[in-house]
Amino acid sequence: MPTYAIGDIQGCHEPLLRLLDVVRFDAASDRLWFVGDLVNRGPDSLETLRFIRGLGDAAVCVLGNHDLHLIALAAGHGRAHKGDTLDAVLAAPDRDELLGWLRRQKLAWREGDWLMVHAGVLPGWTADEVMRHAAEAEAVLAGAHYRDFLAQMYGNAPVAWDDGLEGVERLRVIVNAFTRLRYCSAAGEMEFHHKGAPGTQPSGWLPWFDVPARKSADLAVVFGHWSTLGLVNRDDLIALDTGCLWGGALSAVRLEDRQVFAVKCRQARSPTG
């Protein structure tokens, strides 16, 4: 019963099908972990959502920033961005079923010594705190009053975690960490502007996973989000955004032995950072 973790798809449905052929995916016995950003910017967000939802228990998904953007737009919050390719989802006859399914997905998923998130985790959070904070925000997103949070979801502040945070500020830090984080300070302050590869960042910022004494370092973290980072496969993390959207590859890792599989992708968009 192998488990394959798959990088950011962003509506690139055809490469996903080719990748599943490469790994000889069997829905009756195999499992797929999706690191989020199932939709947007690629050509086939609607087909991608329908396909992954149809996998049922064979698929585990965590939410990415583009997935949350879709949920917010459908709820009448946020504003469409140049380059969005979400109109087909928003106009689909089954949009309510698809979006209801999407907002019930997780922000963090843990099995044994593996942890999956879309972007990152704050270095001051233990593994138990990661799951507890994820559950807080997941309950709001899946609940009856999710629109109240979506109306105030966007924003960078606060940039750091504090146990005393309450309300929307607390939820915003949690969601930003799981879905937007790349760099932070040694003290855990998040930086949201720089998107380049490690080594190009301004002084004082570190990749979140390289902050000294990161409290979740006892887990192997599987994540995406960071196309300029590319594929990384080391003991404490696997990074899986290999730029499918930008003409790179869609990648998967079989967790049992860390074997990497990939298919080349036709460029659907020019990188903007």
Curated annotation (Swiss-Prot):
It comes from the Bacteria. It catalyses: P(1),P(4)-bis(5'-adenosyl) tetraphosphate + H2O = 2 ADP + 2 H(+). InterPro entries: ApaH, Calcineurin-like_PHP_ApaH, Metallo-depent_PP-like. Pfam families: Metallophos. The keyword Lipid metabolism does not apply. Its EC number is 3.6.1.41. Keywords: Hydrolase. GO terms for molecular function: bis(5'-nucleosyl)-tetraphosphatase (symmetrical) activity. Belongs to the Ap4A hydrolase family. Hydrolyzes diadenosine 5',5'''-P1,P4-tetraphosphate to yield ADP. NCBIfam families: apaH, PRK00166.1. This is Bis(5'-nucleosyl)-tetraphosphatase, symmetrical. The lineage of its organism: Bacteria, Pseudomonadati, Pseudomonadota, Betaproteobacteria, Nitrosomonadales. The gene is apaH.
